[in-house]
Every structure is written in structure tokens, then in C-alpha cells.
């Protein structure tokens, strides 16, 4: 950029800052990370992609994506992390599809989990607001926005038209909820589905139910969907690789991605996740299918390397500390193919 353009840009930025306040416009690479309380996601790769170490408390988070992509698994893992730190969690099951046994396998303390299965969208959102106002709940998950059916639709006939009711419901509720969550320092996670807009020829035809309010009020939006081939042991599929893209982030630079590995029946494997990130950070070396830490050979294949680290917790923590030291240089290439 030549000198005249640079000065013109500086003058424009100063005028904008004077009119609208500091931070109204900034360079993406210089965007400061805000210090907020967070709840870890259970995946180091995703915590680093979020830039703040987890999902923010006192804010709204939207997790959306196609069916069976790992959205509920991720939300339940966050609940387990909150409970592990002594927090209280609530699950508003609008879909009436919560599996307590699966939640337990993910580490959720189901006997302490607050669960509601509301009849209407209004009831669900009122429950969320009351729980947040109490100041005693650390994280609330709503599964899902698409299942928040307005009372008028429930009480009406099957063929009745109810245009915009759900969008209006979400807009009214979120206007109130945003301030309540900030005061109580409660994280609210809304799980959402995707729909396709009819007649879209150019651009992305996907949209999410519930209108635009959730997109606007959410501090973080995560796009969660399967990527690549299933994880196999021999010929048996034992899990799926899931790519999470931080589509919106008000607290750190957005558009980062993390690839997670979700295993059937047990969810995220934090040790395998750490191995992926440590390789990306250069803490663990990968030559062919062999994984090494310094002079120590961990094993052939990620499963063997992860197993070796599980048997040596002190080594696991040492590697984690080194990864965190290099977190600013980490290129999140978690879950890359092992060529096995």
C-alpha cells in the first residue's frame, strides 16, 4: 500500500473510532482476544480453534449442522466438562430424544443433570430464562431450536399456516435472555438443524430454523458436520471424523477449524485429540505411521500412541503443557489421515 492510501486509511479508521468507539473496525489479525470465563469443550483442538480455551460463559452459543454430525455429542461433552469442574448443568430436551445411558458414557453425571421436556417453545424458553436468572446454573443446552414449536401451532389444526411464529418467538426470547445470561454468567447452547432454501441456484442453499435472531445474538456459532471416511479398526467402522468450523466468534478471530474424532458409544477421545494437535504443533513427531516424542517412540499408529500416553499420565500432561505454550503457532490439522 502506498503512503497516500495508508494515511487515508488511518484517517478513516480514526474517524470511525471517534464516532463509534474503539474496536468498531480492526484488522482481522490484530483482533484482541477478550478475557472471559470459559467451559472447555473436551477437545483441545476445538478449544484452540475457539481462541479462548472453550465456550464462553455469559453468552449464547449456536451449534448447528446436518443430522448425525455430532452436535448433541459435543453439547453433552461440554456439560460433562462443566460438571467435572463442580458446575450445574441443564438440558432442555425439546426433541424428547435424550439418551441417559449415552450421556453417562460421555461422562455426564446424569443423576445431577437438570432435564426438562417442555410441551411448547414458549415453555422451553421460559424455563431457560428462569434457570439463568437463578444464577446457580453454569450451562444450559437447548436441543433443538427446530423442535421449539410455538403454542399456537401446537393448539392449531395440522394444515394451519403459521408464518414467522417461531422466528418471532426466538427474537422476543433472545432479546431478554442475552442480558440475563450476561448477569448470571451462564452459557446457553442452542443446538440447531439445517434446512435447504427452495430455488437457490447460486450460493449456499442451507439455512437454519428459527429466523435471524439466533444468528445475531450468538457470540459463537459452530458448524459441525462429518468429514471424510469413518474411523476404522480393521474393516470395522468404530467412529466418525467431524469437522467443526467456527463460523462466528465475537471473542477471538473466527473461521478457524478443528477436526474431531467421535467414537461410537464413547464420544470424543481427548488423548487421541491431543496426539493430533501435538503433531500439528511439532511436539510429537510423525514419521510414516510411527509417533515419537523426543527420543521416545510412542507407537505405530495413533491408537498405539494414545494408549502409550494413557499409561503415562505425567507424560500426557507434559505434552499438553508444551502444546499450550505453542498454541499461537499451532496450525489445526487435527485428525489428518494416518496412511494406515
Curated annotation (Swiss-Prot):
Main localization of the protein described in the UniProt heading: cytoplasm
GO CC list: cytosol
Localisation per UniProt entry: Cytoplasm
Entries under SMART domains matching the protein: AAA (SM00382)
Sites where the protein binds ATP: 65-72
Family per similarity comment: Belongs to the RecA family.
Annotated protein name in UniProt: Protein RecA
Gene encoding the protein: recA
